[in-house]
Amino acid sequence: MIHTMRQQDIWELPAGTVVRVRHGLYEHVAMLSEHAIGGERAVVSFSAQAGGFVEEPFSIFARGQTVVIEGYLGILPPVVVMQRARMKRSQAYSLSDFNCEHFVRYAHGVPVESPQLRQWAFLGGLMGILALAARA
């Protein structure tokens, strides 16, 4: 895992490289694009705020936070990963059915899942059990 904010670092990485940034209680996951916007490396993601697919400059994605470079998932070539990502342009965002983690995994052709969603569901279930136990 690499932490970076420097543009020269991210231009060396292939399109489809997975990046993440903390947004409060969750981490927003995206991929480096093959494009530039305003001279910056672009990032593609699936965002609740955008209602789905968004391609934006790296600095907008980062929101002043440190970006963690996760690496490259799967074995599909970058051009195929980007094609698969762009196929989801018209799909609506859904926290439970197709969020940023689902999007990245779909694009890479690996099992589609959301580890953060699974963790939150587990914690919610645990809190429910504790609340019931406290009433007894």
Residue ranges: model-predicted function:
Residues M1-M5, L76-P77:
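N-terminal start-of-chain detector that recognizes signal peptides
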Residues H3-I69:
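Glycine-rich catalytic cores of cysteine/serine-nucleophile enzymes that process amide/ester linkages
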Residues D9, G64, M82-Q83, M127:
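Generic signal for short, ordered secondary-structure residues
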Residues E27, S45-S47, P78, Y106, ...:
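A general secondary-structure boundary signal
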Residues E55-I60, Y72-C100:
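Catalytic toxin/effector domains delivered as secreted proteins or via bacterial secretion systems
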